[in-house]
Amino acid sequence: MVERASAARQAGLDSLFVGDHHVTPFPYFQNSVILARMLSEWGDKPFGALYLLPLWHPVILAEQVATLASLSPAPFILQCGLGDNRQGAAMGINMKQKVGRFISCLEVIRALWQGCSV
């Protein structure tokens, strides 16, 4: 993955993103951790990550995203998704509640970034 970031920079790509799909036949690297490592090879262009909000605790996610955003002067772009039933089942999440969990997670993250107590 680190080599891919370097190759993307050398190829002149405009942005760098990682996904959040825990159920995959391919090797999966936790997005926050791998993106932090990839930044050393990326440079100062926009970067970001997808997070399937129903699968995340909002306080942990708010901390991780704020940390990532602080690692580079380049813009960090947060992508938010709902996920599918396979992702939820793998994490023990009832995906019938995914829209509510998504909205709640986003509200808590925004409140924390504004300095509010939650």
Predicted features by range, described:
Residues 27-31, 54, 61:
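Generic structural signal for well-ordered secondary structure
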Residues 20-21, 50-52, 81-83:
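Histidine-centered beta-alpha loop that forms part of the nucleotide-sugar donor binding/catalytic region
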Residues 1-42, 48:
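N-terminal beta1-alpha1-beta2 module of alpha/beta enzyme domains
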Residues 1, 49-59:
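Active-site mouth loops of central-metabolism enzymes
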Residues 55-118:
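Flexible, glycine-rich active-site loops centered on histidine and acidic residues
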Residues 19, 49, 90-94:
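Short amphipathic alpha-helical segments at helix-loop
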Residues 15, 46-50, 75-79:
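Structural preference for beta-strand elements that scaffold enzyme active sites
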